[in-house]
Amino acid sequence: MRRILPALLLLLACVAPAAAQQVTTRSWTDERGVRWTETTTVEVVEEEPGSERVVGLSDAPEVRSVARFGPFAVIDGSHAALVAETDSLSPADFAAMLRAWPGIRTLELVDCPGTVDDTANLRLGRMIRAAGIATDVPAGGSVRSGAVELFLAGTHRSAAPDAEFAVHAWLDEEGRQPQDFGPDAPVNRAYITYYRDMGMDPANASAFYALTNSVPNRQVLWLHTPDLARYAMLDSPSGL
């Protein structure tokens, strides 16, 4: 069901050796009352004595902003940045931001760890698309887990050549992952439908969902801008 180029998987799996692991868990209840739990194992890579890189936490520099709305920072009249994980309140935060700053046209994603509420996150993505907002990952940007769906929501999407994206399978409270459900089960179709709504053709929507599920929830698959461009149309790389 999930066929991916072995060479791509080998390349991504060998990007860097793990020196240690950090495990984080997040839980949420969707609109149907179903309780979900996602556990992420973060690889910590020793780059030099005394330093480490933890992909599960945001270490982006402070964004200079003129206003804050939940995880969103308003940079100026036409630009905002996502600076933290999203949650159940994020769609309302986004709506409030646009009411106060209706001229915002670009959402920057610098160091985005993901979401603690997948249902709200997909709703937020559709709001970004409906508002006609572009998404951009600048040089050195890192977009992980549920934040990838928000990047894909941009009406125009751009990412620097060195931008990185982390994906993995979801996990419910009973320990089930996508492959434990039929391919046409509502929980699986919801993501494919979302990717279709974000502009992917049927083949790419299914292939990208398969890619995100090619590693279990407790692992992370790293992608880079050219990898993502195989599935979703991107504009010229950020900063070029």
What function would you assign to each model-found segment?
Residues 16-20:
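Sec/Tat signal peptide C-region and signal peptidase I cleavage site
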Residues 1-4:
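Positively charged n-region of N-terminal signal peptides that target proteins for export
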Residues 174-240:
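Charged, glycine-interspersed solvent-exposed loop segments at helix/strand-loop junctions
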Residues 27-102, 111-116, 162-203:
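Small-residue-centered hinge/linker elements
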Residues 6-15:
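Bacterial N-terminal signal peptides
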Residues 91-98, 121-125, 129, 148, ...:
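Extracytoplasmic/secreted envelope proteins and their assembly/folding machinery
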Residues 103-119, 134-140:
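Short, glycine-/small-residue-enriched flexible loop/hinge segments at domain edges that mediate gating
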